[in-house]
From Swiss-Prot:
Assigned keywords, A-Z: ATP-binding, Chaperone, Nucleotide-binding
Gene Ontology molecular-function annotations: ATP binding; ATP hydrolysis activity; ATP-dependent protein folding chaperone; unfolded protein binding
Name of the protein: Chaperone protein HscA homolog
InterPro entries named among the record's database cross-references: ATPase_NBD, Heat_shock_70_CS, HscA_NBD, HSP70_C_sf, HSP70_peptide-bd_sf, Hsp_70_fam, ISC_FeS_clus_asmbl_HscA
The keyword Isomerase is assigned to this record: no
Cysteine pairs bridged by disulfides in the record: none
Signal peptide, first to last residue: none
Length: 622
């Protein structure tokens, strides 16, 4: 007999009362999705109870793909088609990632953002990230029981405009409405501040798999103000893995360039396990055999590991000092240091942070989950689900200065770094030559004084300027940064009123045509995706039915005679035989047959339970 499922009190979704929004931490190593349920933020698990989704996508022939745990397990056997740490490639050109340490991929020199050749064709980091985001979206909708109105997606505070736009493009491709791009340290501060009613100056030290951020925040009642942000968008836990990887190969006298891609991925996976073991043990051993037959079995002490990664630890302290200077505070002024990111579990990191700030860091929230929890709180608020105690204000900052190119290839900064967003700033410029009727506006981002040393974001032209002598025209250039940290630029000639503008789509972002093509491709594979999803759902229901039947037989098998028991066993065996296959209809039919075949058994069990409950009781007691 099929039993209806009833949720716990207060846990049933009520879409007419609340608009469902989630917070997503799109991480280098792992990604998470969280939501506010019953006024409490919580991470949402998959059907196996796992909250972390490995940020790994494996591409197969004919449009097939594996995402998350299954892809991660196969990374060593198919490294060229299994994309890991894709966040490191977001918004980056080929020249910037070609030297990515030990990457086994074939990078494609396409216009704009770097792309990777796989067995299923060329993929951009945006497409790969969209697969991860879509998986989290499906998980959230399954768990919450309705479609999402939007999501807050976190990004490293030190992500530039190109990387932010790439993240937003990936969300759009995954069918997500982005309510806000939120800086990861700020999200962590929201979770920590609201959880602990904290006030004062706090540092958020965020070391993830591929990025590092350090933010200084001032928390007062109801206000989260970012005073300064610094970081390195190419430094993370992966680099600690590579340091150990290089050491192991050097000790064995093996040149990394001679390794097969499968060996590179296998060894990287094993040294990551070794690194994690050294977080709780004074030494750990490696045991791996390469395809060449070489056997590597060194024992690494924690002291050796600490000396290997000391330069990386110091690299995190350089932007830390810079952020403190920008905020005009000292380590002694900091009330607490919040650790974010799985890499902060390493004792070498915690010791360095404690030594620099003169106090042990705060570790009462899970560093893997705190960013997603903070994003969920912000998403719930932006979706309009304002409740008691939700009167708080978030003041974030832009991490890198925005400027314009002037004559001689110089940069004139319009919006300096650490300016609170959203923001608009304007500055007047003039013409260089007599009779000049047009002006080229080149938008750049960075802290250097020369355009060649900064990142080019966009170019556009202002035409129709009245001919005048050089220096007579007045062109007002306005930079406007929205709450996501994304930029729009406007130029207006004051006398004639002629205008031009650009919503900055960086040279490493995606053109609308590219997005449209990817969406079209995703529609083409939607049927494949839905079939795979239906198969997985049927397999899960079949397993649930088999386990429930087995438990019922173990408890009350005596209620069936031999023939009835044989019939139930036969139905269960039939379901078990097809449950791991790929015929959805066969699985559903076998599941229904077992459910129908146990209806009478379920009724007898119910009668038995009622008789047991009423046994020895008088009628007037009932």
């Amino acid at each position: 007999m099929a039993l209806l499922q009833i949720s716990e009190p207060g846990m049933a979704p009520a879409p007419h009362q609340r608009r469902l929004a989630v917070g997503i931490d799109l991480g280098t190593t792992n990604s998470l999705v969280a939501a506010v349920r019953n006024s409490v933020p919580e991470v949402l698990p998959d059907e196996a109870g796992r909250v972390l989704l490995p940020s790994v996508v494996r591409y197969l022939e004919k449009g097939g793909r594996r995402i998350g745990h299954e892809a991660k397990e196969q990374a060593a056997t198919d490294p060229r088609n299994t994309i890991v740490s894709v966040k490191r490639f977001m918004g980056r050109g080929k020249a910037e990632v070609e030297g990515a340490a030990n990457a086994p991929y074939e990078f494609v020199d396409a216009p704009g953002m770097v792309q990777i050749r796989t067995i299923d064709g060329v993929k951009s980091p945006v497409e790969v990230s969209a697969e991860i985001l879509a998986t989290l979206r499906y998980r959230a909708e399954d768990t919450l029981g309705d479609e999402l109105v939007g999501a807050v997606i976190t990004v490293p505070a030190y992500f530039d405009d190109a990387q932010r736009q790439a993240t937003k493009d990936a969300a759009r491709l995954a069918g997500l409405n982005v309510l806000r791009l939120l800086n990861e340290p700020t999200a962590a501060a929201i979770a920590y501040g609201l959880d602990n009613a904290a006030e004062g100056l706090y540092a958020v030290y965020d070391l993830g798999g591929g990025t590092f951020d350090l933010s200084i925040l001032k928390l007062t009642k109801g206000v989260f103000e970012v005073l300064a942000a610094g970081g390195d968008s190419a430094l993370g836990g992966d680099d600690f893995d590579h340091a150990l990887f290089d050491h192991v190969l050097a000790q064995a006298g093996i040149d990394a360039k001679t390794l097969a891609p499968e060996d590179v991925r296998l060894l990287l996976d094993r040294v990551r396990v070794l690194k994690e073991a050294l977080s709780s043990a004074p030494e750990a051993a490696l045991d791996v055999t390469l395809s060449s037959g070489a056997h590597l079995a060194p024992t690494i002490s924690h002291d050796t590991f600490a000396s290997l990664v000391e330069p990386l630890v110091q690299r995190t302290l350089t932007p830390t000092r810079k952020a403190l200077r920008d905020a005009q505070v000292t380590p002694a002024d900091i009330k607490g240091v919040v650790l974010v990111g799985g890499a902060t579990r390493m004792p070498v990191i915690r010791d360095a942070v404690a030594k620099y700030f003169g106090q042990p860091p705060l570790v009462n929230l899970d560093p893997d989950q705190v960013v997603a929890l903070g994003a969920a709180i912000q998403a719930d608020l932006l979706a309009g689900n304002r409740g008691t105690g939700d009167d708080w204000l978030l003041l974030d900052v832009i991490p890198l200065s925005l400027g314009v190119e002037t004559m001689g290839g110089l940069v004139e900064k319009i919006i300096p770094r650490n300016s609170t967003i959203p923001i608009a700033r304007a500055q007047e410029f003039t013409t260089f030559k007599d009779g000049q009727t047009a002006m080229a506006i080149h938008v750049v981002q960075g802290e250097r004084e020369l355009v060649a040393d900064c990142r080019s974001l966009a170019r556009f032209e202002l035409r129709g300027i009245p001919p005048m002598t050089a220096g007579a025209a007045r062109i007002r250039v306005t930079y406007q940064v929205d709450a996501d940290g994304l930029l729009s630029v406007f130029a207006r000639e004051q006398q004639s009123g002629v205008e031009a503008s650009v919503v900055v789509k960086p040279s490493y972002g995606l053109a609308d045509d590219d997005i449209a093509k990817m969406l079209e491709d995703s529609f083409k594979t939607a049927e494949i995706d839905m079939r795979a999803r239906a198969l997985r759902e049927a397999q899960v229901e079949a397993q649930r039915m088999l386990e429930a039947t087995q438990a019922a037989l173990a408890a009350d098998g005596e209620l069936l005679d031999a023939d009835e028991r044989a019939q139930v066993d036969a139905l269960a065996d039939a379901l078990r035989a097809v449950a791991q296959g790929d015929d959805t209809n066969a699985i559903e039919a076998a599941t229904k047959a077992l459910a129908d075949g146990t209806d009478e058994f379920a009724a007898r069990r119910m009668d038995k339970s009622i008789k047991r409950a009423l046994s020895g009781r008088r009628l007037d007691e009932i």
